[in-house]
Amino acid sequence: MQSQVRQNFHSDCEAAINRMVNMEMYASYVYLSMSYYFDRDDVALHHVAKFFKEQSHEEREHAEKFLKYQNKRGGRVVLQDIKKPERDEWGNTLEATQAALQLEKTVNQALLDLHKLASDKVDAHLCDFLESEYLEEQVKAMKQLGDYITNLKRLGVPQNGMGEYLFDKHTLGESS
């Protein structure tokens, strides 16, 4: 049945939003995997684990925001299978943070592609939604991860295990 509230909401945008929901859920799943990897007794970087768990929750919230938006515009939610993360072992904090930055760049590009699609379909509402709810936050997340990578390298990670411990305790421990 067709929605009675649907207006100027192209089916291509609707389908792309469903794909974004899947991508955000995948990102949440990856961060959850990272979180519980760093929480293991043989890794034991609890602030790193907490940071990645918070990222997982944030990505899930992003997915839910898209789901709510889809309904608000009269679109139909079509959920897809969520792919398993590429890895189960995340190595050291530097490796995981580099993987997280790559993930955020992938999500950011998908958001930019969705914004272009919305712009091409003259969907000002979707453009505004993306600009106000997602794009700035993505840039901030990428900057934060980039800063963390710089500081981890400065501390000598991965060669220096003490550097990883200090990053966990002082950088992420302070933000708790």
UniProtKB/Swiss-Prot annotation:
Its EC number is 1.16.3.1. This is Ferritin heavy chain A. Coiled coil: none annotated. GO terms for cellular component: cytoplasm. It comes from Xenopus laevis (African clawed frog). Its main location: cytoplasm. Fe cation 2 binds at E59, E104, Q138. The gene is fth1-a. GO terms for biological process: intracellular iron ion homeostasis; iron ion transport.
